[in-house]
Structure formats: structure tokens, C-alpha cells
Amino acid sequence: MPVYQNNLKDKKIDFDAIKDKVRVFAPATVANMICGFDILGFAVDEPGDEVKMYRVSESGVRIRSIVGDGGRLPLDADRNTVSACVKMLLIDLGISQDIGVEIELIKHMPIGSGLGSSSASTVAGLFAINALLGNPLTKDELMPYCVEGE
């Protein structure tokens, strides 16, 4: 999943401003509408997926738990799209060895339902790490990582 935005290493992260915990919700999407199949789409208020992210003392990215997936999603941080994209972003920021995070993923929509569950989880994870770091990145800078996770 290489995105490699080397310009992100120029971003200054204020380690004193890093939060201990954040929670982000990302809604389901509908993109298969009549003649606008995969062209027209919209987000809905519910359902959606939720990510809780915690700063921990040991560096690295780990999955603490996944709820609502029926045991189908990997807890291995290298094989889960949420944690893999967070890890990639931290590498590109040049701080992957300086920070540790644990992720709780709460799935509120069925996997394979066509509601954009994997996209919602990935976006929530990336917005969560950005919020944890004090929001140093713009939405445009986060976008390549969101696309990579999808």
C-alpha cells in the first residue's frame, strides 16, 4: 500500500499537543443509485463505523479490539486496512518510531453490505490519528491514504 508522500516529513508534530484518546464516527454511503452507478453517491447519518484510538507508551500501531464483525476482520495490524493506513501515514510523517497507538474498531454495519463499511472504517481511522496528533494534516493530505485503504 505505498503512498509515500515525502513532503509530509516537513510537517511539524507537537508531541506535547498529542491527545490521549479520540473517537471518530464515519457514516455509511450509498453509491449505487439508478443510472449514476458508482458516480452519484451520498452519506447517511446511520449506520456507520466508529474508531476509538488511544495513545500508548510502546511505539507502533496495534488493534486493541474489533466489535461487530463476527470475527471476520484481522487483528493483525499489517493486514487490517485501518491500522495499515494509519501505520503508513505515521511512516510518511517520519514519526512511526516515536508514537504508539491502539485502535478499537466498532462495526455498526455488515461487512459486504454495499454500504461502504471498509471505506468508513479507513476514513474514521485516518481522521482519528489526525485528531490524536492535533490535526496537522488537511483533508487533501489525508485523501491518498483514504483511497489506499479502500
Predicted segments, located by residue:
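ATP-binding N-lobe of GHMP and related small-molecule kinases
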Residues: 2-113, 131, 135
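Short acidic-hydrophobic sequence patches enriched in Asp/Glu that either
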Residues: 78-81, 121, 138-141
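Generic structural marker for isolated residues within well-ordered, non-membrane alpha-helices
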Residues: 86, 126, 143
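DPxDG-like acidic metal-binding loop motif
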Residues: 115-138
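Alpha/beta catalytic cores of group-transfer enzymes, especially the acyltransferase/condensing modules
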Residues: 137-150
